[in-house]
Amino acid sequence: MDCKYLKECGSCTLFTSYSEQISFKTDLIKQNFSHFYDGKFDLFSSSPKHYRTRAEFGIWHEGSKLSYTMHASEKGKKVFIDECPKVCEQISHLMPRLLESLQDDEILRTKLFGVEFIACKSGTLVTLLYHKKLDSEFEAAMKILASKLDVMILARSRGQKLLSGELNLVDELNVDGQIYKFSLSENAFIQPNKAVNEKMIAWAKECVQSGADLLELYCGHGNFTIPLSFKFKNVLATEISKSSIANALKNCELNGVENIKFLRMDADELMSAFAGVREFNRLKDIKLSDFNFSHVLVDPPRAGLSESVINFIRNFKNIIYISCNPETLKENLNELTKSHKVIKFALFDQFANTHHIECGVLLEAKR
């Protein structure tokens, strides 16, 4: 990737050609997981540039001049940038226009310390972060800027949130030729590499030849849930975030899905419900014994699965595990492979030019 800040900016950590990066990551995964799996490792690569649909930058002030900043490779320092080849073209084209407009407006540039971008099918959301009170004069200036740049703007300060207008964040994913629509909130967790996300979902669908019912933990706004729902009779999906559950319900409507039950419940609560040791009002309309689960899907945070969750999902014949941290995946597989065997293993290069690796594993109960 051609970048004038390469090695100076701390965002990228691999500087070889993309083919060499892929070879390095593939070899690393094979070395660490070959004792779990001796079959073919599926590799899903990324475009080496313009792949990020979400980006965050600091803002540096020098008089009336503003600069985007990133953490430098040298600890404790910043690097001033005017472009980033990793961001998608939708964000890349907007970055200089936004900065110029902010510089020209004293109300909008004063006390601004950060900018965040989310690009999707319906448009771009720009979040402006401030160390000041946001008043009516500010709100008027923000709305003018949003109209000028044809974007949605969200301004945040401590205890304040102002929107330039209606928030309409809707993205589309193309998975095996099927279009899925997703409504997002400004604080939703989204996979920043859209193209690789589509490949991850397609791979997860391939893991299911035929299924009865699916249980999903950590479902978010339904990124995997909704495409996979067409492979199952019924789906029960859990998530702790209230806003994610709200988006997930909206996304069912957008995609005409009626066989998913979403529960705002963490993994420990769900396990208590399955064990019958605690009753939940949230389950008053859901009878767990009515489900015939053939698969469980987990997409945990970097910390991986707790011991109790591992013991719980051992009760399922098929486990689809999406991991954003190979280290905790390896720890979890040490336990899971006592009862299950690895059937498929995939590597997803979500973040080109970095050491980050995401994996997908299909496990099946040993007979």
UniProtKB/Swiss-Prot annotation:
Active-site positions on this chain: 324 (nucleophile), 358 (proton acceptor)
Keywords of the record: Methyltransferase, S-adenosyl-L-methionine, Transferase, tRNA processing
Catalytic function, reaction form: uridine(54) in tRNA + S-adenosyl-L-methionine = 5-methyluridine(54) in tRNA + S-adenosyl-L-homocysteine + H(+); uridine(341) in tmRNA + S-adenosyl-L-methionine = 5-methyluridine(341) in tmRNA + S-adenosyl-L-homocysteine + H(+)
Assigned EC number: 2.1.1.-, 2.1.1.35
GO molecular function list: rRNA binding; tRNA (uracil(54)-C5)-methyltransferase activity, S-adenosyl methionine-dependent; tRNA binding
Entry keyword S-adenosyl-L-methionine: yes
PROSITE patterns in UniProt: SAM_MT_RNA_M5U, TRMA_1
Chain sites annotated for binding S-adenosyl-L-methionine: 191, 218, 223, 239, 299
SUPFAM superfamilies: S-adenosyl-L-methionine-dependent methyltransferases
Keyword tRNA processing annotated: yes
Record's GO cellular component terms: cytosol
Top-level division of the source organism's lineage: Bacteria
Family annotation (Pfam families): tRNA_U5-meth_tr
GO BP of this protein: methylation; tRNA processing
Job description of the protein: Dual-specificity methyltransferase that catalyzes the formation of 5-methyluridine at position 54 (m5U54) in all tRNAs, and that of position 341 (m5U341) in tmRNA (transfer-mRNA).
Annotated family: Belongs to the class I-like SAM-binding methyltransferase superfamily. RNA M5U methyltransferase family. TrmA subfamily.
PANTHER family: TRNA/TMRNA (URACIL-C(5))-METHYLTRANSFERASE, TRNA_TMRNA (URACIL-C(5))-METHYLTRANSFERASE
Protein name: tRNA/tmRNA (uracil-C(5))-methyltransferase
Species, as recorded: Campylobacter concisus (strain 13826)
Organism ancestry: Bacteria, Pseudomonadati, Campylobacterota, Epsilonproteobacteria, Campylobacterales
